[in-house]
């Protein structure tokens, strides 16, 4: 959940949705979907990946089922494959239509969000595999936590330090929600450790501006989580170990996130529920 008072819907100038992907690194361009909001920041960032001179492209997260956005995203060299960071609708709702527009298979960790196209198979993504497409090496990283199927994509050849498309695992502004019941704080912290080990690579998030040092961002995220857990422990007091009921979630949310804006209250409750379950597991 983003800090209170943060304007989650402002659009960075470099990400304005003009209908044409804007280059953000040597190998990645972004087309911003027209779906700004409290949970999507300035909107979902659909990424277009290709090596210089490549005749095909890779698209990551087609985004919402918006015809104008999908048509603009499909315009250009042939899309070889579509990759999905996780199952949420702001990333996947347009995937089936985009597969029809481009003839490109859609691959996701969750088989329910894989779409074959024009007899081209769409196998589920596997953590640890390397995809070779559009002149690129794309390393698939299983990074569950935000959701159980959350996946990141490492481009080791993108500039001197590479880049990582982090989906909603690491955002360009604020911090992400652990989407209960599918998400897991324990898994999320493990995923942060894995991302930090990559080093000072460029962060290409699904929401918010790109960032310069993944390892530094991850350290900030971990400090934020530790601080929130300390607040939750304090709010629990002598109720530590009690069953995680909705009444307990409400009480802790009011104590820890009392100043959160109304549009983010549901996300705050999800985060509290995830933290309570984490503590109940013996953290």
PLM regions with names:
Residues 14-75, 152-167:
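Conserved beta-strand hairpin/beta-sheet module of binuclear metal-dependent hydrolase folds
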Residues 37-43, 62-139, 158-162:
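Active-site HxH/HxHxD metal-binding segment of metal-dependent hydrolases
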Residues 54-59, 64-66, 137-235:
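Metallo-beta-lactamase
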Residues 85-91, 146, 207, 275:
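Histidine-centered divalent metal-coordination motifs
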Residues 236-283:
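C-terminal regulatory/interaction regions
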């Amino acid at each position: 959940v983003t800090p209170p008072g943060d304007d989650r819907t402002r659009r960075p100038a470099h990400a304005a949705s003009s209908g044409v992907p804007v280059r953000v690194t040597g190998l990645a361009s972004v087309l911003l979907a027209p779906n700004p909001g409290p949970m999507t920041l300035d909107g979902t960032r659909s990424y277009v990946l290709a090596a210089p001179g490549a005749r095909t492209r890779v698209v990551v997260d087609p985004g919402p089922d918006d015809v104008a956005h999908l048509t603009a995203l499909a315009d250009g060299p042939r899309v070889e494959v579509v990759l999905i960071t996780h199952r949420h609708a702001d990333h996947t709702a347009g995937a089936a239509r985009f597969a029809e527009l481009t003839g490109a298979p859609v691959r996701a960790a969750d088989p329910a969000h894989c779409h074959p196209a024009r007899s081209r198979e769409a196998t589920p993504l596997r953590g640890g595999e390397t995809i070779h497409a559009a002149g690129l090496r794309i390393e698939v990283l299983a990074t569950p936590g935000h959701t159980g199927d959350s996946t990141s994509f490492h481009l080791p050849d993108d500039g001197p330090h590479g880049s990582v498309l982090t989906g909603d695992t690491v955002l360009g502004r604020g911090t992400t929600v652990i989407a209960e019941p599918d998400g897991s704080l324990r898994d999320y912290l493990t995923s942060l450790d894995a991302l930090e080990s990559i080093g000072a690579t460029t962060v290409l998030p699904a929401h918010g501006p790109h960032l310069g040092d993944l390892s530094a961002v991850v350290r900030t995220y971990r400090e934020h989580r530790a601080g929130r857990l300390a607040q939750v422990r304090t709010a629990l007091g002598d109720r530590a170990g009690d069953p995680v009921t909705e009444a307990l979630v409400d009480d802790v949310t009011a104590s820890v996130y009392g100043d959160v804006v109304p549009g983010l209250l549901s996300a705050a409750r999800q985060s509290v529920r995830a933290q309570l379950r984490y503590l109940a597991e013996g953290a």
